[in-house]
């Protein structure tokens, strides 16, 4: 019978040897990666039970303590559509604002933007999609009409010197249309970039992407948008999130979205499971010798906290492997 070895106090005994491994055969990799933590927004928005505001605030504060440079705090959407985000103003006002850390919020329209600014937002995000049917089911308009709705937000943001990040949903597949053309993703990304979004996050909303699809999609997008303005946002429905992210890194992308404990999904995407777990991403990047500035131990503690609060198990493989037995 095999014996079970308890985790060592540092919990992560393999990282030193991983860092020593050669990465010369993996192509050029960035020296540092900016991680955009989306757990408090994308991770929690689909939870069936309403998460208490103090829990959300503590989670964000713990993520700040862990050194995440960007933490998407909440979403200024209608409580009718996403009840979990009804406390958006209280959350944004209640968190500790750490120096050097950005706390963007999702603002789908002018009303949301105005409420976000009133609550102290310094950066906002808008959502586009590369799927016509997804856009209609999500926001009840065409892709072109969705851009028209963003015009007011972009103008107001420029006037207030507020940065805007753009998302492209369904970049590697759609729950309604199936395959999505890389050319369509490139077209939507180019439009968001030309409108003034400083960064475009390409999302595999339902997690159907593979490394080959990621390569083809990024190849098309890179003809329209500078690599420095791109990020990837992978869901792990088919267990491909880390592999897809690694392909993006090899192609020059140095910004990656992820969610603590692998929380999240998409309320409009049937079958979508959680996001790429931030713990797993940090572990991989550290093993590749890529700087993140994130304290993995503190990140694991944040994951433990929110999983206990939600009464659920973590989706992070690293957290599962290093838990106290």
Swiss-Prot record:
Signal peptide range: none
Location of N6-acetyllysine modifications: 48, 111, 137, 179, 324
Binding site for substrate: 41
Annotated organelle transit peptide span: 1-27
Annotated positions binding a divalent metal cation: 42, 233, 235, 275
EC number: 4.1.3.4
Any one Pfam family match given in the protein's UniProt record, by short name: HMGL-like
Positions carrying N6-succinyllysine: 48, 137, 179
This protein's GO CC annotations: mitochondrial matrix; mitochondrion; peroxisome; protein-containing complex
Pathway given in the UniProt record: Metabolic intermediate metabolism; (S)-3-hydroxy-3-methylglutaryl-CoA degradation; acetoacetate from (S)-3-hydroxy-3-methylglutaryl-CoA: step 1/1
Tissue expression summary: In suckling rat, highest levels in liver and in intestine. Lower levels in heart, kidney and cerebellum. Weak expression in brain cortex, medulla and midbrain. Levels decrease slightly during weaning.
GO terms (BP aspect): acyl-CoA metabolic process; ketone body biosynthetic process; L-leucine catabolic process; lipid metabolic process; liver development; mitochondrion organization; response to fatty acid; response to nutrient
Domain of life: Eukaryota
UniProt entry keywords in alphabetical sequence: Acetylation, Disulfide bond, Lipid metabolism, Lyase, Metal-binding, Mitochondrion, Peroxisome, Transit peptide
One MF annotation (Gene Ontology) recorded for this entry: manganese ion binding
Family: Belongs to the HMG-CoA lyase family.
Role description: Mitochondrial 3-hydroxy-3-methylglutaryl-CoA lyase that catalyzes a cation-dependent cleavage of (S)-3-hydroxy-3-methylglutaryl-CoA into acetyl-CoA and acetoacetate, a key step in ketogenesis. Terminal step in leucine catabolism. Ketone bodies (beta-hydroxybutyrate, acetoacetate and acetone) are essential as an alternative source of energy to glucose, as lipid precursors and as regulators of metabolism.
Protein name: Hydroxymethylglutaryl-CoA lyase, mitochondrial
Organism of this sequence: Rattus norvegicus (Rat)
């Amino acid at each position: 019978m095999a014996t079970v070895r308890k985790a060592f106090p540092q919990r992560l005994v393999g990282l030193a040897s991983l860092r020593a491994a050669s990465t010369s055969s993996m192509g050029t990799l960035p020296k540092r990666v900016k991680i955009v933590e989306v757990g408090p927004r994308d991770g929690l928005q689909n939870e069936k039970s309403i998460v208490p505001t103090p829990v959300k605030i503590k989670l964000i504060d713990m993520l700040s303590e862990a050194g995440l440079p960007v933490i998407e705090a909440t979403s200024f959407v209608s409580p009718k559509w996403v009840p979990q985000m009804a406390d958006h103003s209280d959350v944004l006002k209640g968190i500790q604002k750490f120096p050097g850390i950005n706390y963007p919020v999702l603002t789908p329209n002018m009303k949301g933007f105005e409420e976000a600014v009133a609550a102290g937002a310094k950066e906002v995000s808008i959502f586009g999609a590369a799927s016509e049917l997804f856009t209609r089911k999500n926001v009840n308009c065409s892709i072109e009409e969705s851009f028209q709705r963003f015009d007011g937000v972009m103008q107001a943001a420029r006037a207030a010197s507020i940065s805007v990040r753009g998302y492209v949903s369904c970049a590697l597949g759609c729950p309604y249309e199936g395959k999505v053309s890389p050319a369509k993703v490139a077209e939507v990304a180019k439009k968001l970039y030309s409108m003034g979004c400083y960064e475009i996050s390409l999302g595999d909303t339902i997690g159907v992407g593979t490394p080959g699809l990621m390569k083809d999609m990024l190849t098309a997008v890179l003809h329209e948008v500078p690599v420095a303005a791109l990020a990837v946002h992978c869901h792990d429905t088919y267990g491909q999130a880390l592999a897809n992210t690694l392909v993006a890194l090899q192609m020059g992308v140095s910004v990656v979205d992820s969610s603590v404990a692998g929380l999240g999904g998409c309320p409009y995407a049937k079958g979508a499971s959680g996001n790429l777990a931030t713990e797993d991403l940090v572990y991989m990047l550290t093993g590749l010798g890529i700087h993140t500035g994130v304290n993995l131990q503190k990140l694991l503690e944040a994951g433990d906290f929110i999983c206990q609060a939600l009464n659920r198990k973590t989706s992070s493989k690293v957290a599962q492997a290093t838990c106290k037995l």
